[in-house]
């Protein structure tokens, strides 16, 4: 591998301009200021190469190795475009099965295929792999969702790999571990020995080794209220009970059993042979994972929750920012990708009373496709491999490879948040304006958590505002200590700082963080602070006002046929979903002012809705839905805007909703859109209104 550059035949990028295309943002609506600090460059991909990144690693000579979901491995020389010359792509291996991880070791490449951990070598130095060795293989059932990820190397030289659960046939919503070690993390040695490590994963797409410790990223789904990052130790149970099917095996280190979970949380399993009933959210509060963990030793709760729809919808890779300052002031912190929303979040950790905890804040969004894998270049830049086939993404492209470069300018950001015995300490990258920092009305802290249940995802529960009673700004202006009442252990705390400014009067680049408070530290409580009292908060708008706040004769969501429609609707439509974030009908044609009955059915595996909006407003409505924040799910991700003409409820997988509305009186092309977070870019259709 050391002389790989000289030995591979090169594939010239014919017809592509020198260098890279600069991408200031995915679209004009994204915060332009992000690009002032971390610019994005799009690597050109030769025609005919489908570069759906499943694995990505930097080689010792600075080249990249990229493994694709289609089973190819490419070597990309000169990825940073030095001397204004093009990158070169060379196929190193092919014929593998859906690679979703890649590592370099001693001149070879090691990757997770669907059913095995494989090591490939170029023994004759001709630039192509000629030896494919099985390091360790595991059984598969053939279900499409049995993805395998990794490896990542532990300090002792062994590797971690993880595997998805499958789903049922008739009960297609229910995660299943059909064969051994699905839904587990496994430790594998280079000589092919496997040790089951931890159970309870659902879709563990990201593996991170941080200071020698193993962390993994999880996706929202059944039993998973939202995405998160968890510190994993041998014997941990991580939350999804399907993999506990194998916990009785003698080689299993996991002590939790399915009965421990099912006796405390009803799994609502359909009987063999049916009827098959998909579990839906119940009005009762239920239990949170941490509450079950108090009763069942061995359950590991997340170190950092990533609120669904806010910091992503499909958590992917984990990487650690190098401490050499080539990538700005955040050295040692994590970056966590999100495939569905085409973004990266930044995570800062601390350890309190033996437990990892910390916060997350948005870092960079606007990638061209779904963020799947990340690797660091020798110059300190970040390469981001992307894909969205079958999964969908906010980014519009099927695949992409981009480079994120620190421009040298320091953004005004939350550097980190630390838990205190009586509140939080927030550290910033620049000194704050003291007047704005001491204004209690410029802060807003809300604690909340998710349900632990067999339903896909969870609404926010137990959300309560936390009163700020005191503020103290450090002498250098870079730290603000908050005295906070109402903090709760194991809860997520949304910390919003919309009023904070730096010395130049600039607002934070990203003003909201989400801190998971697993333990309150001991220590000295705050003294010498400025006592404060917040102004009364405005009462939240009622959901009814949200649904009916317009001047139409019909409510924006009318679910029964209006009594004046004695002859019934003029036109009836059934609209469905297709994989990849699409409606099954791209256009509906209606007459101006006609009476419409529309039923939307959701056959997808994630929630969707239908909003009919005014011309040209689909993207702004989609962004407004994301900005609903913690209230988004409660409001069905339907913002209270005049541009929203009619809408369904938020429809869970397998569900349907019927609405009645009057078609616009003015002919033209209107848009219908799904505003569930991350969907609005691609999930759109046209309502063509004719005279």
Question: What does each model-identified segment do?
Answer:
Residues 423-436, 484-486, 497, 600:
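A short glycine/threonine-centered beta-strand motif
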Residues 103, 554-559, 642-691:
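Extracellular/periplasmic metallocenter environments
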Residues 458-475, 618-667:
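Extracytoplasmic beta-sandwich strand-turn segments characteristic of Greek-key/jelly-roll folds
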Residues 408-413, 433, 497-557:
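Acidic, Ser/Thr/Gly/Pro-rich low-complexity segments and short DxT(G/T)-type signature motifs
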Residues 408-409, 566-595:
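N-terminal edge beta-strand
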Residues 26-411:
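Beta-propeller domains with acidic blade repeats across secreted/periplasmic ectodomains
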Residues 431-470, 495-502, 511-514, 612:
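Short, surface-exposed alpha-helix to beta-strand junction/turn motifs within ectodomains of secreted
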Residues 57-58, 63-64, 72, 586-612, ...:
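Beta-strand cores of secreted/periplasmic/IMS beta-sandwich domains, seen most often
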